[in-house]
Amino acid sequence: LIDIPIYAQTDLDEIYRIISKVNEEAVPEHPEILKEPDVLGPQMASNGQFNFRISMIVQGGMQISIYHIFYRLYHEALLREGIELPTLGPLSKGK
């Protein structure tokens, strides 16, 4: 699973478009991806952060490598298209 933090007011249609474009261009270059990525869309993490989630099925042992490659591709494409992404700070443990 790849979770990209997003703001609640982000244009989801635009994110779907950008993610789909990245997948069309990059997935064919990675035969270790066994099935077309499943774009699950917006999710809420337990800490209240909104994320945009993409699921991929890949060859065994390739999960971490593909995660890092595609997280970077998605992140760069979203920023290039003017989508603002939050930067998460350290989470408070509370008192």
Where are the language model's segments positioned?
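Structured, soluble regulatory/oligomerization domains located on the cytosolic or IMS-facing side
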Residues: 1-95
